[in-house]
Design a protein with these regions (language model features):
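Terminal, non-catalytic protein-protein interaction segments that mediate quaternary/complex assembly
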Residues: 1-276
Length: 276
């Protein structure tokens, strides 16, 4: 059975059984009909994924892996803040009339800073360090720029990555301030797992662990029945994953270089309402 499924089920059970409900509290998020979107939450969730053991895609329901990877590349590779550069409609609600989400996500990745080795952006700094000083304890990114928050369509949810090399393994910690568990949990796990694999390949390393730290892991009130049904579904082995081995430059990767095989999964859950 998929380890990712087991972690997801355990997390959801913990939230539903011991989580804190925001009912009666003032909340920002709203459903499309204007109703307050309340949640049940757990503070400080930590899930560990061994990327050598399996590729952590859920089998409880399908994850659109290529679409998730495209969003990750939109941020990390294309460093774009315009949804016209994205092959999906995930960000439509947060974009302005020109398609911009402001100074968020990809915009922050493209900002250049003066590092000891020269002027470059955060992504290039990570790649440079992994190639030249892989055992450094300072290999990280952070896109939660307080100065620019007022100009962001959405403040970053997944906001920092810390990379750590142990032997020949590239490990990473993904820090997330908030997560809609049903809509986004496996989406984020999949895309950052692929990122670790890609960075490992272009720097001569092997993918190790992805540790996902979520400050506020929550299930929305209208998602509770969906989650309760979903976690009772049968679980299947994780799909097989590989990257095109010919790619040696991070900026040459496309979604076509991500190969997923034997992905056995349950039916998709359609028309999931999203709180905004």
């Amino acid at each position: 059975m998929s380890r990712a499924d087991q972690l997801f089920v355990n997390m959801c059970k913990e939230i539903l059984t011991n989580g804190f409900s925001s009912e009666g509290q003032t909340v920002r998020a709203r459903w499309e009909d204007g109703t307050p979107a309340h949640t049940i939450k757990t503070f400080g969730v930590v899930n560990r994924y061994d990327l050598q053991e399996e590729f952590p895609a859920l089998t409880l329901r399908p994850t659109a892996i290529k679409t998730a990877v495209d969003e990750m590349l939109w941020i990390w590779q294309r460093k774009s803040n315009n949804i016209k550069d994205l092959n999906g409609h995930i960000w439509d609600e947060w974009a302005d009339e020109n398609g911009s989400i402001g100074k968020a996500y990809g915009y922050q990745m493209g900002v250049k800073y003066k590092f000891a080795q020269g002027e470059m952006d955060q992504v290039d700094n990570v790649i440079w360090q992994l190639k030249n000083t892989p055992y450094s304890r300072r290999i990280m990114t952070n896109i939660y720029n307080f100065q620019d928050l007022s100009e962001m369509g959405l403040e970053p949810c997944a906001y920092s990555m810390t990379f750590n090399v142990t032997g020949d393994r590239l490990n990473a910690i993904l820090n997330q301030r908030s997560q809609d568990v049903l809509a986004a949990n496996n989406w984020n796990v999949v895309q950052y797992s692929v990122l670790v694999h890609m960075l490992a390949q272009v720097t001569g390393l092997k993918a190790g662990e992805l540790v996902h730290v979520i400050s506020d892991a929550h299930i929305y009130d209208r998602h509770v029945p969906v989650i309760e049904e979903m976690i009772k579904r049968p679980q299947y082995p994780a799909p097989k994953f590989r990257l095109n081995p010919a790619v040696k430059d991070f900026y040459d990767f496309t979604t076509a270089d991500v190969i997923i095989e034997d992905y056995q999964k349950n039916p998709q859950i359609l028309n999931i309402p999203i709180a905004i």
